[in-house]
Design a protein with these regions (language model features):
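Generic structural signal for individual residues within well-ordered alpha-helical segments
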Residues: 7, 17, 81-85
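N-terminal amphipathic/basic helix or basic patch
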Residues: 1, 11, 15-18
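Vicinal oxygen chelate
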Residues: 1-4, 25-75, 84-111, 122-128
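Conserved beta-strand-loop-alpha-helix junction that forms the acyl-donor binding cleft
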Residues: 7-12, 102
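Helix N-cap motif at beta-to-alpha junctions
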Residues: 12-13, 78-80
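Conserved active-site tyrosine of GNAT-family acetyltransferases
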Residues: 16-21, 87, 115
Length: 128
């Protein structure tokens, strides 16, 4: 099984998809219902909240309230530090500045306009 797409549910499809198009540096046709952006072998999709709200389900094993629209997207890049100024120029607020993790990854995290966490990482000591 391979990841084909990570889809985000939002009230502002064009706005959130536009942010990711600028982040990834790819052109895309925007509309208010559904947008898909190719991001390497997988894609990032955006759909309107009213389109998916009836598909929500409870998670009885969760220790507390379930946030039904939360995700973290991981984007692998060659050099985290080289991406930092470009992404900063998009006006993001950093949750974690470029940091080397104990397991060797170099990563930085921020929230997109809808509040989702975005992790941009590189694996300096690994070949992928």
């Amino acid at each position: 099984m391979n990841l084909a797409q990570c889809r985000m549910v939002t009230d502002d499809v064009a706005g959130l998809a536009g942010f990711y198009a600028r982040l990834l540096g790819v052109p895309t046709a925007l509309n208010e219902y559904y947008v898909e952006i190719q991001a390497g072998p997988a894609s990032v999709g955006f759909s309107r909240r009213r389109f998916t709200e009836h598909r929500e389900a409870d998670c009885p094993s969760a220790p507390g309230p379930v946030r039904r629209d939360g995700i973290i997207l991981d984007f692998l890049v060659g050099d985290v530090d080289a991406e930092y100024p470009r992404i900063t120029a998009l006006g993001v607020g950093w949750v974690l500045p470029p940091t080397t993790q104990p397991w060797g990854n170099r990563s930085m995290m921020f929230r997109d306009p809808a509040g989702n966490l975005i992790n941009v990482l590189s694996r300096p000591d690994r070949e992928d």
